[in-house]
């Protein structure tokens, strides 16, 4: 349990260090490779860790983030991924598209956490 908490803290700290100054999103080939890696993971927690690590290092588009989210079953984990990855989104003008599958309450939670 302590190691999981430690990983979450490390990833949270890394958000402020990486991905906040996106100049361009990753290429389609690179993204497809990352997506396949995530697809092979067995559970949402493992997928969350990988997606968080990738988005801390790479700039992604809203559509790419949505592709990652589609691999997750648990809705709360989807919210967490958006919160964790939002700073790495290149095309923030498409945020509305990203928020379409969330309730108003979840949208407000996400937006509060990324400001």
Segments (PLM) and residue ranges:
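Sec-dependent N-terminal signal peptides
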Residues: 4-15
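General marker for long, soluble alpha-helical cores
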Residues: 18-115
